[in-house]
Amino acid sequence: MNLKKLSLIFLALTIGTQALAANSIEFGFENEQYEEMYNDSDTFNPYVKVNLNPKKDSPLLLELKYMYFHQYGKNRNEGHDARFKTNKKRIEFFASGYKYKNNNFTFSPKVGFRFEASDVNRTEKPKSQTDRMLNLRFYPNMTYDINEKVQFYVSGFVGPQINRVQHGTRKDNSYSPTSKDSAIYWHDWYQEMEVIGVKYKLDNKDTIWASLYNEYKRNEYKENYTRWQLRTGYNWNINSKLSINPFIRYDLSYVTTNDEATSDHGKEKDSHETRIGSTVKYKIDPTLTLGGEIYWQNAKTEDYKGKDNPDKNRMFYKLSITKAF
């Protein structure tokens, strides 16, 4: 996508926010950088996000986000004839506003979807690449207040995922290594849930929190992923304008199971990831907020024979500016 097209999208969304009683509009980017061995995965991802109130005095809130992924590492290392997808567009849409409260318990769900379309370069050798993905998502957000200081919570999403694999298919019963046809898989699944979390509010209004996180991803006739992770962090309100929120994520278990219709079906391999970082927010004025995030991540993986792969280290950077109306 060239700069002109991206500018037109930003302009259209900006005009739309005025027409639909926008709560806020956010512009930003994410950048992922890997060590030399894996740096073909380096990406730069600009985005725009809008929160809308379609009806005045209604609790209904609509969220729309557009992000463009430029995998410049792949272009840098393989050129314009790179065999794999190098660019991707993502659209997210969510609706929320309903809230059920019963004494100390609250239930405030959110529903929506994520859609991704990838640019896949065609080659003589068929490769299994997903060029379209639709993930329907339900967020069963719940909280329970023990007292004024302690709160338990559940957050995250669950939902089915539909993938179209281009230029070869996953290894199902009809797999052909020379096929260049597309195949759609309707029974994939994706969820990320903090199944139980706890927050403790300190006397100075800062918050300490910890949670048990589960990720499950099913790619039919390819691989299934099951992760259990410990997450913890500290929300530090330095003053009325600046907040810094350091966090740690540590895998307790991360198992990948082979789901191909081959002799490797059912084999497992272990992975382990550790992430250390922080988010930051600075309120420039009552309607303008600067945001950011940085983290370092180490990933250890192995193959289905139990052989360790070289560690995959990543640095992540994010910068955003949000205008409230």
Label every model-predicted segment.
Residues 1-26, 57-61, 309, 325:
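Cleavable N-terminal export/targeting peptides
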Residues 21-79, 316, 322:
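Short glycine/proline- and aromatic-enriched beta-strand/turn motifs that initiate or cap beta-hairpins
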Residues 23-25, 56-64, 100-108, 148-154, ...:
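Repeated loop/turn-to-beta-strand initiation elements of outer-membrane beta-barrel proteins
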Residues 29-37, 52, 66-74, 97, ...:
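Transmembrane beta-strands of outer-membrane beta-barrel pores
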Residues 40-46, 50, 83-91, 130-138, ...:
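Residues that define the transmembrane beta-barrel architecture of outer-membrane proteins
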Residues 46-54, 91-98, 113, 138-144, ...:
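Residues on the lipid-exposed face of transmembrane beta-strands in outer-membrane beta-barrel proteins
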Residues 141-263:
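Detector for outer-membrane/organellar transmembrane beta-barrel domains
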Residues 282, 294, 311-325:
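Outer-membrane beta-barrel "beta-signal"
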